Amino acid sequence: MMKKIDVKILDPRVGEQFPLPTYATSGSAGLDLRACLDESVELTPGATTLLPTGLAIHIADPSLAAVILPRSGLGHKHGVVLGNLVGLIDSDYQGQLMVSVWNRGQQSFTIEPGERIAQMVFVPVVQAEFNLVEDFTATDRGEGGFGHSGRK
């Protein structure tokens, strides 16, 4: 059964002046989020800013969450990434989706109204249950970490 998620449009320009979020291809996992701005924003090297998306979300189902991820082209070509690296949207959050952007590049970057700035992916959630134990059942790896399995 397909799950439905309530995404509210807060800014009347979404769907009119700015396209609704869509999946770019049939295999796309992420929906593009756009900067709902009245005017361009210049992001100088090293600067961060919060950008509104014009969308609010309430996932409601605790077995789901959303993550906001950078768009690969912005980071690779321009050095513009998410200020918090990944945004996590819990199922009980009900506010506007804001995107923190950070210019880690060497040049100023201008964000235009309606520009695609990030992508949102819905993911399943598994919550951990903690149990106090004395030890674990032994495995071949044991406590080996940080390069334990080698490079080749």
UniProtKB/Swiss-Prot annotation:
GO MF annotation terms: dUTP diphosphatase activity; magnesium ion binding
Record has Cell cycle as a keyword: no
- Catalyses which reaction(s): dUTP + H2O = dUMP + diphosphate + H(+)
Residues holding substrate: 71-73, 84, 88-90, 98
Q: Which UniProt keywords apply?
A: Hydrolase, Magnesium, Metal-binding, Nucleotide metabolism
Its Gene Ontology biological processes?
dUMP biosynthetic process; dUTP catabolic process
Top EC class per UniProt? hydrolase
Recorded hits in Pfam families, A to Z, give: dUTPase
Kindly give the InterPro entries that the UniProt entry links to this protein.
Answer: dUTPase, dUTPase-like, dUTPase-like_sf, dUTPase_trimeric
Listed cofactors: Mg(2+)
Listed SUPFAM superfamilies:
dUTPase-like
Q: In which pathway does it act?
A: Pyrimidine metabolism; dUMP biosynthesis; dUMP from dCTP (dUTP route): step 2/2
Q: Under which EC number(s) is this enzyme classified?
A: 3.6.1.23
Q: Which family does it belong to?
A: Belongs to the dUTPase family.
Task of the protein:
This enzyme is involved in nucleotide metabolism: it produces dUMP, the immediate precursor of thymidine nucleotides and it decreases the intracellular concentration of dUTP so that uracil cannot be incorporated into DNA.
Query: What is the recorded name of this protein?
Result: Deoxyuridine 5'-triphosphate nucleotidohydrolase
What is the organism of origin for this protein?
Cronobacter sakazakii (strain ATCC BAA-894) (Enterobacter sakazakii)
The record lists the lineage as: Bacteria, Pseudomonadati, Pseudomonadota, Gammaproteobacteria, Enterobacterales
Q: Which gene encodes it?
A: dut
